[in-house]
Amino acid sequence: YIKLLSLYFQKSMLYCVMVKIMKIGNVDIKNRIIMAPMAGITNVAFRKIIKEFGAGLVVSEMVSDKALCYGNQKTIEMLTIDEDEHPVSIQIFGGDVDSMVQAAKFVDEHSNCDIIDINMGCPVQKVLKAHAGSYLLQYPDLVYDIVKNVVEAVSKPVTVKIRIGYDFDSINCVEIAKLIEKAGASAIAVHGRTRSQMYEGHANWDYIRQVKEAV
């Protein structure tokens, strides 16, 4: 009986995830299965495969704001989208308001994506040196300025990916999430680890819950 009850709840949870429609801005997401952006992996071919398995939303590899501003052809090609993968989000990263706005406008005007996502969660050193990704979590005012200016510059919904904090001494995901909401973002994704954890240890779902309750 207990096994049957457990199976029933598992199927019920899966049903809720698969059929519950989510809306991000003016974009309808048919279910709550969202493919996370992964550098070097989530190109157009990979995204199409994931779409065939029923994902509600797919997200591109992270795209450098500076590379778009400089007109790097290889980076521009990362904006390629197949008609079969909608809805799809293009994720950009950077640490400067002006270049992020310029990059977001380029994506808005030259890509047929449905959503523009801002990466404020990547913990790798190369991104941190560019004052981007989870580096930005140390500077809430800059987070607000980037999101607000990007939102105002584009016609598509803007979402933001964050972590719970830069390290265990500076967990500020609720504060950051409130600022992102105030800046006009349509949705927030939270990785339940700090920047210092990288991809190790356990994700702290309690902080994710706190963000969910706060915004």
Region locations from a protein language model:
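Short, positively charged and aromatic/hydrophobic N-terminal segments
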Residues: Y1-Y8, M13-V17
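Flavin-dependent oxidoreductase catalytic cores
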Residues: Y15-V215
